[in-house]
């Protein structure tokens, strides 16, 4: 299995931002130079990038179609992108706009049957399921929903197995407690997922801070890692991460 580094940009109101643990009230701005940053990813040798529409994630209705198209045409990057995907037409339109892969998050928790139907329609290489998780006091990985204020009926384990059995290929999993904290990814979580669903290509997300974290994700058998804050704040050099 090849290992992919996904440099990431989260966009809100046309600006590159980062949220701390997904909290819109704890937002850091990094400028509005989206296309130049994407070009820099490509210049460093990246093949893929991860693009998140935070406006759509909150209100629905993907807003980055034009930006996505510009990035795909100008840089040649394969773009994995999502935010606010609510319907089959959302998936189709984002793919038509230039996405290589569409990320489906909260809907994948709320309506797995619908999303499994999309897997069969669009193909496993065109969709990534993104599951945000938090470990409860009993050690169970739960799936917070509705802005992380409620907990889904299904656990992470149950949903990961369900999607794996349905033919899912790409799973992006974020430990909410690590997101934006630069505290290192949760190695135990990803080892658990790899053991539970070895057929899935698991992407590490949340907490990556240095080359050791990238190397650890690769050594653990994960398929890739999403790098956001560490790149934006200069804690990690993309060239070195790609060569890891």
Curated annotation (Swiss-Prot):
Enzyme Commission code: 5.3.1.16
Keyword Amino-acid biosynthesis: yes
Pathway(s) of this molecule: Amino-acid biosynthesis; L-histidine biosynthesis; L-histidine from 5-phospho-alpha-D-ribose 1-diphosphate: step 4/9
Record-linked InterPro entries: Aldolase_TIM, His_biosynth, HisA_bact_arch, Isoase_HisA-like, Isoase_HisA-like_bact, RibuloseP-bd_barrel
Main enzyme class: isomerase
PANTHER family (UniProt xref): 1-(5-PHOSPHORIBOSYL)-5-[(5-PHOSPHORIBOSYLAMINO)METHYLIDENEAMINO] IMIDAZOLE-4-CARBOXAMIDE ISOMERASE
Family named by the database record: Belongs to the HisA/HisF family.
Annotated protein name in UniProt: 1-(5-phosphoribosyl)-5-[(5-phosphoribosylamino)methylideneamino] imidazole-4-carboxamide isomerase
Organism: Xanthomonas oryzae pv. oryzae (strain KACC10331 / KXO85)
Lineage, highest ranks first: Bacteria, Pseudomonadati, Pseudomonadota, Gammaproteobacteria, Lysobacterales
Gene: hisA
């Amino acid at each position: 299995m090849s290992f992919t580094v996904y440099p990431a940009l989260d966009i809100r109101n046309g600006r590159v931002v980062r949220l701390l643990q997904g909290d819109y009230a704890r937002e850091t701005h990094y400028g509005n130079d989206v296309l130049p940053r994407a070009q820099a990813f490509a210049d460093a040798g990246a093949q893929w990038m991860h693009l998140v529409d935070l406006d759509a994630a909150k209100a629905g209705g993907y807003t980055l179609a034009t930006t996505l198209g510009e990035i795909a045409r100008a840089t040649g990057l394969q773009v994995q992108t999502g935010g606010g995907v609510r319907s089959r037409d959302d998936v189709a339109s984002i793919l038509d706009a230039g996405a290589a892969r569409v990320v489906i998050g909260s809907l994948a928790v709320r309506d797995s049957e619908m999303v499994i139907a999309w897997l069969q329609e669009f193909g496993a290489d065109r969709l990534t399921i993104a599951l945000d998780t938090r470990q409860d006091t009993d050690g169970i990985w739960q799936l917070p929903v509705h802005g992380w204020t409620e907990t889904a009926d299904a656990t992470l384990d149950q949903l990961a197995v369900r999607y794996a059995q349905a033919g899912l290929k790409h799973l992006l999993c974020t430990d909410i407690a690590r997101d934006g904290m630069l505290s290192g990814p949760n190695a135990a979580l990803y080892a658990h997922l790899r053991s539970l669903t070895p057929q899935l290509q698991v992407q590490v997300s949340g907490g990556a801070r240095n080359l050791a974290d990238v190397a650890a994700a690769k050594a653990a058998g994960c398929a890739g890692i999403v790098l956001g804050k560490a790149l934006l704040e200069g804690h990690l050099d993309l060239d070195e991460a790609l060569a890891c």
